[in-house]
């Protein structure tokens, strides 16, 4: 359990780190790390998701909130990111997964280079170019219509096009043009130059920059495949990439990768991998998407690089759950265009296993890690008297007792450790939670040290507290900045249930689990009262077997929710068992309006129905069946009880079928299920 908690702590840090770089990258065009390093951060997130229980993982965003300087445009269809793979096994898993999902033995795959540029969306109405937007956070982007219109060769009018057509692609700058543009070293690389050039309030600056683009997607057309989409885009006058291929097997996918990989330096633009897409658009639609990426596409990123440097010092970070994480401070070294100065050492056992010591010469690998990894220690260059690293016996932040939990070392002072309190407060206001603009970790520390924000409810009482404190006398604070912050807090007094649950920072509950809980319980009162009711059962029991039976009832209800596991159930029970958490919830509800879940499928006969699947389905995989059910507003459970509305029974349904008959649960065979969901679509 301790190892899992440690991983979730690291996962949370990574999410916050990515959010920080999202703002620098998407809003300010002033990244502190190169694109390749950012991709590696995202890759680590994917790797950790694979190691964590599904309900624990956090759904990270696909960009950053739109820059306040620009008007906003809401995307009709989200501009999602892509799942990444870094080896052939990852590509093979992708192909196997989509075949299994679709129950198809052979699937045609479209292959194309992944352009290292800035994503855009352009909308045409009756052939006339009317607006363009950046990706933004994937749902809302910046309005860059006038800027895109200045790009040489970008179509302003499309012949013989009616109704609405949306074109998506990537804006970039050629390497040769970048060298001419960047004589004063204003930009780190061509991608940053493209982003900075496009997002100019003065469009004359954009017009004078050598921006180019490739189009790769079309929404609103009648094409049936990705290859047809590219051909149509080309016929309409858009620039499309010449390097593309169709294949129906793994060897063909890898052959295209190797071909492009070997010629990539002869191209006059940067690419950072290959994109694979299911060619058939109907199959793409069936596959659907997760919160952050389409299931029908994969980016196979180029491989890792290595470098040697010196490890200066090992220091300890304390996270919001109290885990002590060792981090290596390195002499900065350039690895494939990325300046690396830190490496994650994970835990005490990792340091002992690798025998890492301060002053060592180490080999760093950069390949999708949260912070690049130390893969080798040059012990031959080590001083004979170099001491081994000694893990602290007390918390370096608060001086409290630490205790070993598996490989993790944890500070036990949850309520008094400053690092943990700051971590929880910072998580509460972070992206994905309350997302309060202008109130990040730096400001949280500032207000904490002043005694103005000591616990979460204090955030919403800050204005009243400032009546007795002259904040404008503090450095960097004036009337305008104070007003902006208070307005930002005021604007976050209404929040959806899933974001509220996530904001609480309950161990093992990321955005995925929070959304599952919100969809199941629908309203805050129902969720809160259900948790309290389940806990009250424990208070009424005696000891021994009876206690175990009642305790299991708490787990039974939660584990029955599709995607929720035992760890989440245990964590919720622990959270609601603590009086200070109950008080915090009551205080927060005095300040907040927590919105109930509003289904987009309110007219569906499956809306808010609870469904259990059993047996083998022939017309679709179990995974696709669950996706289709949830899309129509249903809740999917794995446990059968009298509360279940329908049992969908495939071949060889087993004991669940008999139990459903006994309980009087409605039973649908596969044909009835198939007709039900398809009648919903046709309507």
From Swiss-Prot:
Its EC number is 6.5.1.2. NAD(+) binds at residues 35-39, 81-82, 112, 135, 170, 277, 301. GO terms for biological process: DNA repair; DNA replication. It catalyses: NAD(+) + (deoxyribonucleotide)n-3'-hydroxyl + 5'-phospho-(deoxyribonucleotide)m = (deoxyribonucleotide)n+m + AMP + beta-nicotinamide D-nucleotide. One of its GO terms (molecular function) is DNA ligase (NAD+) activity. SUPFAM superfamilies: BRCT domain, DNA ligase/mRNA capping enzyme, catalytic domain, Nucleic acid-binding proteins, RuvA domain 2-like. Residues 601-683 form the BRCT domain. Belongs to the NAD-dependent DNA ligase family. LigA subfamily. This is DNA ligase. It comes from Wolbachia sp. subsp. Brugia malayi (strain TRS). The gene is ligA.
């Amino acid at each position: 359990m301790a190892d899992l908690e440690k991983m979730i702590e690291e996962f949370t840090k990574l999410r916050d780190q990515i959010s920080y770089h999202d703002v620098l990258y998407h809003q300010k065009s002033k990244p502190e790390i190169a694109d390749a390093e950012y991709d590696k951060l995202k890759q680590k997130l994917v790797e950790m998701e694979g190691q964590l229980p599904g309900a624990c993982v956090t759904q990270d965003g696909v960009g950053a909130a739109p820059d306040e300087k620009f008007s906003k445009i809401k995307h009709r269809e989200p501009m999602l990111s892509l799942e990444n793979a870094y080896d052939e096994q990852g590509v093979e898993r992708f192909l196997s997964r989509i075949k299994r999902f679709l129950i198809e033995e052979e699937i045609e795959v479209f292959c194309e280079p992944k352009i290292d540029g800035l994503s855009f969306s352009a909308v045409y109405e009756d052939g006339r170019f009317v607006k363009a937007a950046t990706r933004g956070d994937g749902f809302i982007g910046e309005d860059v219509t006038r800027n895109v219109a200045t790009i040489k060769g970008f179509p302003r009018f499309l012949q013989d096009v009616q109704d609405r057509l949306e074109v998506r692609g990537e804006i970039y700058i050629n390497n040769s043009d970048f060298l001419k543009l960047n004589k004063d070293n204003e930009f780190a690389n061509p991608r940053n130059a493209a982003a900075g050039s496009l997002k100019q309030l003065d469009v004359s600056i954009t017009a004078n920059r050598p921006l180019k683009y490739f189009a790769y997607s079309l929404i609103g057309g009648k094409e049936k495949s990705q290859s047809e989409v590219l051909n149509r885009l080309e016929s309409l006058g858009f620039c499309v990439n010449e390097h593309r291929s169709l294949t129906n097997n793994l060897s063909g996918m890898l052959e295209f990768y190797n071909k492009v990989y070997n010629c990539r330096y002869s191209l006059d633009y940067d690419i950072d991998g290959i994109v694979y897409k299911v060619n058939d658009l109907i199959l793409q639609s069936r596959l659907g998407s997760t919160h952050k990426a389409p299931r029908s596409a994969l980016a196979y990123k180029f491989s890792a690089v290595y470098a040697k440097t010196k490890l200066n010092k090992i220091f300890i970070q304390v996270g919001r759950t109290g885990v002590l994480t060792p981090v290596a401070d390195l002499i900065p070294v350039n690895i494939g265009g990325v300046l690396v100065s830190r490496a994650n050492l994970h835990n005490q056992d990792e340091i002992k296993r690798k025998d890492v010591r301060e002053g060592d010469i180490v080999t760093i690998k950069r390949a999708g890690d949260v912070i690049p990894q130390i893969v080798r220690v040059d012990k031959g260059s080590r001083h004979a008297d170099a001491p081994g690293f000694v893990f602290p016996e007390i918390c370096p932040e608060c001086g409290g007792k630490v205790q070993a939990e598996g490989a993790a070392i944890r500070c036990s002072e949850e309520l008094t450790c400053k690092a943990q309190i700051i971590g929880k407060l910072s998580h509460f206001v972070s992206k994905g939670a309350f997302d309060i603009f202008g109130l990040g970790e730096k400001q949280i520390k500032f207000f904490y040290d002043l005694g103005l924000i000591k616990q979460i409810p204090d955030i919403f009482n800050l204005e009243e507290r400032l009546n007795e404190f002259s904040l404008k006398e503090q450095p960097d604070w004036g009337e305008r900045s104070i007003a902006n912050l208070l307005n930002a807090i005021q604007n976050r007094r209404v929040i959806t249930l899933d974001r509220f649950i996530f904001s609480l920072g309950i161990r093992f509950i990321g955005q995925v689990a929070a959304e599952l809980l919100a969809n199941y319980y629908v309203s805050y009162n129902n969720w809160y009262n259900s948790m309290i009711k389940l806990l009250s059962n424990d208070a009424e029991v005696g000891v021994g077997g009876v206690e175990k039976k009642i305790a299991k009832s708490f787990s039974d209800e939660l584990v029955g929710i599709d995607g929720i596991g035992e760890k989440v159930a245990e964590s919720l029970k622990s959270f609601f068992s603590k009086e200070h958490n109950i008080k915090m919830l009551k205080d927060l509800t005095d300040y907040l309006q927590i919105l109930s879940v509003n289904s987009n499928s309110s007219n569906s006969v499956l809306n808010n129905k609870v469904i259990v699947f059993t047996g083998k389905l022939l017309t679709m995989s179990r995974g696709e069946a669950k996706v289709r059910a949830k899309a129509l507003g249903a809740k999917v459970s794995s446990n059968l009880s009298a509360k279940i509305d329908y049992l969908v029974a495939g071949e060889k349904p087993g004991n669940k079928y008999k139990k459903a008959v006994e309980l009087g649960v409605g039973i649908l065979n596969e044909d009835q299920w198939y007709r039900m969901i398809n009648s919903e679509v046709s309507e």
